[in-house]
Regions:
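First exposed extracellular module after export/assembly in secreted or surface-exposed proteins
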Residues: 34-220
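Bacterial Sec-dependent N-terminal signal peptides
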Residues: 3-48, 218-220
Length: 220
């Protein structure tokens, strides 16, 4: 069950190994060892000092023309809060790209019309961080949508929930050139206060999550 949910992250880790993700099973991190609030803020201030304008959001998409490349991307940028409040903002998140992974056709059609959004992410720096690189867990906050769809054309409150990578920490280099990246996944869709089972990954129908990777854009 768990392996199915993290298969995408395994694939992305192979495809983009150059991004230097660090395993969540890093030696010395027992799960009970945390940074002090002062240490946490110190790392967050150091991360916020960087510029992250040339970024990309990679996401799963069905590609019948090239089954070995089931990933697409959009340009993005990131700003990390300078207040040490564990938040960063990712721009141009492609909400419409989720449509192909939604089994409810009416909802999928409505999602396909949603414009890209800037979304806030919460993050927490991990104790295995160094003076060179901050390792962290990050996840977008829920996206709330008011959508009108269906044969009755009724308004529905739709909430998209995400989870962080179950395998790898995100990373942020603290010296130039700055490199930043983390993985996450769409995990649940709620409609009008009820959890649904509408997520059906178009690249793997047994997958009930949709994977994303946020990182520096490759130089052309």
């Amino acid at each position: 069950k768990t392996m199915k949910k993290i298969t995408l992250f395994s694939i992305l880790a192979v495809l983009f190994a150059a991004m230097s993700f660090t395993s969540c099973n890093t030696d010395g991190d027992s799960g009970m060892n945390f940074l002090t609030p002062e240490q946490q803020k110190s790392f967050q201030y150091a991360m916020a000092a960087g510029s992250y304008n040339n970024m990309a959001i990679l996401y799963e998409t069905k590609n019948d023309a090239n089954v070995k490349n089931q990933v697409d991307s959009v340009a993005s940028s990131c700003s990390i809060s300078m207040y040490g409040d564990s938040t960063m903002t990712m721009t141009n998140f492609p909400v419409a790209a989720l449509a192909e992974h939604i089994s409810n056709k009416d909802l999928a059609a409505a999602i396909a019309k949603v414009a890209p959004k800037a979304i806030k992410c919460k993050y927490n720096v991990m104790p295995n961080s160094t003076s060179e690189t901050a390792y962290f867990i990050a996840c977008p906050e829920a996206i709330n949508l008011d959508l009108t769809y269906g044969t009755d054309n009724k308004s529905h409150k739709v909430v998209l929930y995400f989870i962080p990578s179950q395998m790898y920490y995100g990373y942020c280099t603290l010296k130039e050139p700055r490199q930043l990246g983390f993985q996450f996944a769409l995990y649940q869709i709620w409609v009008d206060g009820n959890q649904t089972n509408f997520i059906q990954n178009s690249t793997n129908s047994s997958n009930t999550t949709v994977g994303f990777l946020f990182r520096n854009a490759w130089k052309k």
